[in-house]
């Protein structure tokens, strides 16, 4: 066999081979015998099917298996010549040429290797971190909100007129052109006036009503209303108000602290203020990281940490980005790409820079996670998806199964690891005082969130 290998850089090698057709044919009998042991053909006992019949019926499979076996042998010899162990391979080799000639095959393939990454410049990559300080005014605002959120609603006298922040119990039905519309009728519906739970004009129409009162009013749905069949249309609503309850706002004192921090011993107002201040700091930190610093850190990692990337993995990522783009294209654009291969190649090529950066950052994050022993347990992935399902009104089990079926669980896990790695290094650049706030918050993270 004529085999040539070339090491392009630390992450890429190339092989060229010209195995003879005879070499391929020598493999036919052995492969046919394996197939004969497994298949069942009418008129023959299992394992007793004539080899000639197996070769005829399974010719395509035998040819394919023989080619795969031959290529694996070529790859094994190529790795041996290059001094590379199979554990250092990453992904599958990219077969760039496989042509059958009169007496031989012409085969070429790119081989991707796990990159060598030196992380000595990581400190240079982490931007300075200045999280906005939490002042007393912000703490007091949050305390007022907590006093409101934990307040109870109490019954009012029959003469009270509905006002903002009251809790109403109502029946209502909506009509368009005097015909009830789908989803427009509800009984014993609870609504806090001014909460924007319903359309603003709907809530305004209820102001001043009294318990037992009935009212009719018209409003126009916004043109961008989520229910398309109602968008921009005028509707008549008939409403009956059953009950008005007023919010009994709690005082900001130790009693409020005991309610909010119900699971903590010795809960008092000063402890609540400390928890609130810490929570506000965390919110400021997360917002700064997500809106600015994580992306800045990624850009610095991309710019300063240099190493060879396996071309095979970049090509796979380009394929993925191209396929994902096709899903969001109009049918006409997809058809245009199908009919014009050159245009399709250009479109795929347009993803090269994004694919290269994505692959590079993934390798860096993986290396940093291993060095710092940062990981994500499978249960944490499921918890994240469970929370996503609750927030979007989906069935958690169905959502998790959907991710599993589409092989997306690994991507979710990698995204969570990336977030933890970036947060870990940004937290290192916090001031000493802010790091102390973080340390105080961590033991209480699973207890109470005062937000």
Curated annotation (Swiss-Prot):
Pfam families, sorted: FKBP_C, Trigger_C, Trigger_N
GO biological process assignments: cell division; protein folding; protein transport
Location of the protein in the cell: Cytoplasm
First-tier enzyme category under EC: isomerase
Database matches in SUPFAM superfamilies: FKBP-like (SSF54534), Triger factor/SurA peptide-binding domain-like (SSF109998), Trigger factor ribosome-binding domain (SSF102735)
Highest taxon listed in the record's lineage: Bacteria
MF GO annotations: peptidyl-prolyl cis-trans isomerase activity
GO CC terms: cytoplasm
Annotated InterPro entries: PPIase_dom_sf (IPR046357), PPIase_FKBP_dom (IPR001179), Trig_fac (IPR005215), Trigger_fac_C (IPR008880), Trigger_fac_C_sf (IPR037041), Trigger_fac_ribosome-bd_bac (IPR008881), Trigger_fac_ribosome-bd_sf (IPR036611), Trigger_fact/SurA_dom_sf (IPR027304)
PROSITE patterns from the UniProt entry: FKBP_PPIASE
Catalytic activity: [protein]-peptidylproline (omega=180) = [protein]-peptidylproline (omega=0)
Domain PPIase FKBP-type: 165-250
Domain free text: Consists of 3 domains; the N-terminus binds the ribosome, the middle domain has PPIase activity, while the C-terminus has intrinsic chaperone activity on its own.
Function: Involved in protein export. Acts as a chaperone by maintaining the newly synthesized protein in an open conformation. Functions as a peptidyl-prolyl cis-trans isomerase.
Protein name, UniProt field: Trigger factor
Record organism: Helicobacter acinonychis (strain Sheeba)
């Amino acid at each position: 066999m004529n085999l040539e290998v070339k090491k392009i850089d630390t992450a890429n090698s190339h092989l060229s081979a010209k195995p003879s057709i005879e070499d391929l044919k020598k493999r036919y009998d052995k492969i046919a015998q394996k197939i004969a042991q497994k298949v069942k053909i009418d008129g023959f006992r299992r394992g007793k099917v004539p080899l000639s019949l197996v070769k005829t019926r399974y010719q395509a499979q035998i040819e394919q298996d023989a080619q795969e076996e031959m290529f694996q042998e070529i790859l094994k010899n190529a790795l041996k010549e290059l001094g590379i162990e199979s554990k250092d391979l990453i992904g599958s080799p990219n077969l760039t040429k496989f042509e059958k000639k009169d007496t031989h095959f012409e085969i070429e393939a790119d081989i991707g290797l796990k990159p060598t990454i030196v992380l000595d410049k990581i400190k240079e990559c982490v931007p300075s971190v200045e999280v906005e300080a939490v002042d007393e005014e912000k703490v007091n605002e949050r305390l007022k909100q907590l006093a409101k959120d934990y307040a109870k609603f109490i019954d009012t006298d029959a003469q009270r007129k509905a006002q903002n922040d009251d809790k109403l119990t109502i029946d209502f039905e909506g009509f368009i052109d005097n015909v009830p519309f789908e989803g427009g009728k509800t009984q014993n519906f609870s609504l806090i006036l001014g909460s924007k739970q319903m359309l603003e004009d709907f809530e305004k129409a209820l102001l001043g009503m009294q318990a037992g009162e009935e009212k009719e009013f018209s409003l126009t749905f916004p043109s961008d209303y989520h229910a398309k069949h109602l968008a921009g249309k005028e509707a008549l609503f008939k409403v009956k108000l059953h009950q008005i309850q007023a919010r009994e706002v709690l005082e900001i004192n130790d009693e409020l602290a005991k309610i909010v921090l119900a699971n903590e011993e010795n809960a008092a107002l000063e402890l609540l203020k400390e928890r609130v201040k810490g929570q506000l700091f965390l919110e400021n930190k997360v917002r700064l990281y997500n809106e600015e610093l994580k992306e800045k850190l990624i850009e610095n990692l991309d710019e300063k940490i240099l190493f060879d990337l396996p071309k095979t993995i970049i090509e796979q990522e380009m394929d993925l980005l191209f396929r994902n783009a096709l899903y969001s294209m109009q049918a006409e654009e997809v058809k245009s790409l199908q009919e014009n291969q050159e245009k399709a190649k250009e479109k795929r090529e347009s993803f090269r820079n994004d694919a290269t950066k994505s692959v590079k950052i993934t390798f860096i994050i993986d290396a940093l996670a291993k060095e710092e022993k940062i990981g994500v347990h499978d249960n944490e992935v499921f918890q994240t998806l469970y929370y996503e399902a609750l927030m979007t009104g989906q069935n958690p089990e169905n959502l998790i199964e959907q991710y599993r079926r589409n092989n997306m669980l690994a991507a979710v896990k990698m995204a969570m690891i990336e977030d933890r790695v970036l947060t870990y290094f940004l937290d290192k650049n916090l001031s000493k005082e802010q790091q102390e706030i973080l340390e105080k918050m961590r033991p209480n993270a699973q207890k109470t969130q005062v937000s």
